[in-house]
Amino acid sequence: MNAGHNAALVPCPPPLTGGQKKFSGVETGAQISVDWLSLTFKTETSREREYVDSDGAVTWYDQLDDVKRAVWAGSGIDPTEWVDQPHGWNGYQQSAVGPCGSLLAWNAVGRDDYHVSLPGQACGMFSEISMRSFLRYSLNKNAKCTRLDINLDDHDRIVSPLQVEQAAQGPDIVTHVHRGMTQRGFAIGTEETTGVTVYIGQPSSRQRLRVYDKGLESNGEIDAVRWELQSRAEAAETLLPLLGVFDDGTMMSWGETFAGRLVSFVDFRNAEDHPTDARQRKRLAWFTALVQAAEKASAYPPREPRYINDVESWVEKSVGPSLRLLMEHWQDDNLTELRRIMAEAQLKPKHTAILARGRTPSNLPGFKY
């Protein structure tokens, strides 16, 4: 299962030279690409930077050079193309910029804590397989992914950004998001529209959808409507392995990954089919043309179940001082007010589940007597 039209789907842009934005030869169907990648690498111990040669001599390798070589292997950005800057970046002591807006930042001491940021044009220098390889390298290095955007370029223009806005304002949208925004550009002194961008989600959210006319933005070089799903924090962390290479060497289609993530974030289904249960509603035809029969793929890891002792610990640390304050104020040995508050409190389903679960089983990690 892939996003877009099966016969015309290009799963990833072909390799590009530095600075190019045009995906040559793609005029119909849908195309999937990685459009932003930010990673933070941190070595936990100095031993991981040790290299012992055949004579037993211990030397240290520079991890910053290591990641430069990894970027070079995937994108063609030569390690010598990074230009050191006279300032740091975002809390890091030192930084360097490379082609297409790529950025490296690190701390001078030990050079074992560093960040790499590859915006859209820099990601466009990777082929699919080289991007997958770089993501696998990042996983092997225990890198933390702070941002990872994946795009669908709809060259058939199945729906316009304004039509997406209209659908998002109507009853057919299925999402947990509460806010959206539309930006419009215009030429001064004329009624000419220079672009419409629709956002679903907040700038600070872990996921945000951006739909816009890439043809207008790129002066016709990429004649498509772009669906850009931005992922940060946990959403980026769980997306990274899906776009790389699994331990057994298998790979998941980028089209399948995009479609599953998109419909878990926002779906468009006919509200007239069922008044309350969105699962019984039929997906709208235009959205089906983009994602087919895609099923939800959760962007967040499942929450660990909470137990009675977790609640006890939380009450002791967070509520204990407030309870002490009230008890000092009430001066009530019979706990009348406290009993009243407890009697009026209503247990929610999550509370009854914790009550049924009881205390932490002794075979779970973190159990203490």
Task: Please give the residue ranges for each predicted region.
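Structured, helix-rich domain cores that form ligand/interaction pockets
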Residues: M1-R306, W314-Y369
